[in-house]
Curated annotation (Swiss-Prot):
GO terms for molecular function: DNA binding. InterPro entries: SfsA, SfsA_C, SfsA_N. PANTHER family: SUGAR FERMENTATION STIMULATION PROTEIN A. This is Sugar fermentation stimulation protein homolog. It comes from the Bacteria. Belongs to the SfsA family.
Amino acid sequence: MRVAVFDCDGFHKKFWSPVVKFPTPLIEGKLIKRYKRFLSDIELPNGDVVVAHCPNTGSMKRCQQDGARVWLSKSDNPKRKLAYTWELVEVDAQYLACINTGYPNKLVGEAISNGVVKELAEYPEQKAEVKYGEKSRIDWLLTGNDGRKCYVEVKSVTLLEEDGLGYFPDAVTDRGRKHLYELAKMVEEGHRAVMFFCVSHTGINSVTPAAHIDKKYAQAFVEVVKKGVEVIAYQVAIDSQEMKVVRSVPVVMPTLLD
């Protein structure tokens, strides 16, 4: 098992292993409701209802059905206002999705460092959360032996609507569109730029921009791909102990209608 150490541009050094494990054994529960974006009421197996932190600012479309099975982590830190964090949800009574948006960047960093992502092999230097563009941070900045840089923006995909096809975004995102144009700018400056869809839903077999949800994002996606921004997607294997990036899945270009 190889462990890489990265100097993360202002962050503490982080240790990555081939598998991202949850910090504590997860606790199964039942979702009562999500509210105020960051809060959720969860019923535990003993019947107690706890308020858990929901680490996801998105709409979580199809991933927050009342009554769904969910899995929580519990912190022993007495300074935390909420001891529980919502990590996973069962979708359509058969798939698992990771709703904690703090994990995709870690998963992708682990996959790159361990050679799982063949498209991003042979970049000996990796830095996380590096400032670039207009008041933005790139998720991963890779540097090759020749000094050429590769900018990698990571997006988590959890919206499944039909036949294994996953959609991003699950709500209108001006910020996401801005990230696309910033990647295109890096290409114009002579660098490599990659949009990396981290498929955090076990039922998703391919990914496409959600033109029916955010047409402007889909239009920008098509535009920047024509300018040289690369797009790749990898699926994550998920269970209640750990997660890991396992395989490449196709990216389908959107159909844009007037």
